[in-house]
Regions:
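Hot-dog-fold acyl-thioester-processing enzymes
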Residues: 2-111, 176-321, 385-388
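HotDog/MaoC-like acyl-thioester-processing domains
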Residues: 2-33, 111, 116-223, 229, ...
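Catalytic-pocket segment enriched in acidic/His residues
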Residues: 135, 284-285, 290-292, 297-301, ...
Length: 388
């Protein structure tokens, strides 16, 4: 069959869409307005044992506090807790790609800030309220392609008891889909490994340290101290699929009849695949050719996947007696399929405030090329020897 349908024509045409002042002003008028959830509901409402386990598996985090109820019952939480960045399954990092009214502009997630107030415990029911945040623009070519528009989305999360669990702010870059020729990444070489390379990576993976049940006391932490790394990779499409299973189908992964109905309602959300079939823009995470059209030389990781890796790093370091108060992870470079990432951190400051023993951490990730692909920061609270 070679007949071109109207939907295919629309999908092909939209690849050339560009940002307009009308689009930008329309989005600015929505700042502070709650985002409609009808087309993109929460993937998880109740964090039962399956949901907690699946998110931990999806991020490659083996911490028993997410899996083992007998172990978790002995911690200060008294039960299993969900990985902190599981809030992505409630719409964080998702909705702006489908509800921000800029059809034809690619949405590239840049990072999220989280303010965590309390853990999500086994069987907690969490509801999210998401609102449009501020928008900034920058004329001229971005480091990826075309006009640069940075959008934000704010989230608030409440449990079944009416208690505030967390707040978030997403950052998403919107730009013309065709601009690959301007990319600074066009000469970035793909990773190729030999047996010795893989053995060295495996050895680094095995060096991962989880504090676990042994308290890390605030008094014992020193400014300038580096926290033990964790290694993610070499990244495979399987890793991305595993995370997607945990994160949820939305915004675009809607199979068969459900996908057909969404495409009929939102044809401009699709572009034709190499076989002429309208398909979702999320293909940039497994299809090299589509990634190239936005200026990235190969398929690459999911942004929320990478942010969640840092939740794994931080929980390893603070242990069962600590808590992540604030986490800010920003993506600086793409992590291509095949890349290996070393996630690290360093103590920048320690202080006491409002009865909490606080530590500020600088965060980053480097790949096998020694590129810094990710930067960030975190504030964590730790127990004090004076309190034990």
């Amino acid at each position: 069959m070679t007949q071109t349908t109207e939907t295919q024509k629309t999908a092909a045409t939209i690849e050339h869409a560009t940002a307009s002042e009308e689009m930008i002003e329309q989005m600015r008028s929505r700042v502070g307005v709650e985002i409609r959830r009808s087309a993109t509901p929460q993937f998880v409402n109740q964090w039962n044992a399956d949901a907690i386990r699946n998110y931990a598996i999806g991020t490659g985090d083996p911490n028993p506090i997410h899996y083992d109820e007998e172990y978790a019952a002995q911690t200060p939480f008294g039960t299993r807790i969900a990985p902190p960045n599981c809030l992505f399954s409630l719409g964080v990092g998702t909705l702006m790609a489908t509800t921000f009214g800029m059809p034809g502009l690619h949405a590239l997630y840049m990072g999220t800030e989280f303010w965590f107030e309390r853990p999500i415990k086994l069987d907690d029911e969490i509801q999210s309220t998401l609102t449009y945040g501020p928008i900034t623009t920058q004329d001229g070519a971005s480091r990826f392609a075309g006009t640069r528009i940075v959008q934000t989305m704010d989230g608030e999360f409440v449990n079944q008891n009416g208690e505030h669990v967390a707040k978030s702010r997403d950052h998403v870059l919107r730009f013309d889909r065709h601009g690959g020729g301007r990319s600074k990444y066009k000469d970035l070489e793909r990773a190729v490994y030999d047996d010795a390379d893989l053995a060295a990576i495996d050895a680094d993976i095995e060096k991962e340290v989880r504090r676990g049940s042994e308290p890390r006391y605030w008094e014992d932490v020193e400014v300038g101290e580096e926290i033990p790394w964790i290694v993610k990779g070499p990244l495979t499409v399987t890793d991305c699929i595993g995370f997607k299973v945990a994160w949820g189908f939305f915004p675009f992964c809607r199979p068969n009849r459900i996908g057909f109905e969404y495409r009929q309602a939102h044809p401009r959300a699709y572009t034709p695949n190499p076989y002429g079939v309208p398909d979702i823009p999320e293909r940039v995470h497994w299809e090299d050719a589509l990634a190239e059209t936005i200026g990235i030389p190969a398929a690459f990781d999911y942004g929320p996947q990478r942010v969640s890796w840092f939740g794994h790093l931080l929980l390893n370091w603070v242990g069962d007696h600590g808590w992540i108060e604030y986490q800010n992870v920003q993506l600086r470079e793409p992590i291509l399929i095949g890349d290996t990432s070393w996630l690290q951190g360093k103590v920048e400051r320690k202080w006491q405030e409002d009865g909490k023993n606080l530590v500020s951490l600088n965060l980053w990730a480097k790949d096998q090329r020694d590129r810094t692909t990710t930067t960030g920061s975190a504030h964590v609270s730790l127990p004090s020897r004076a309190e034990s």
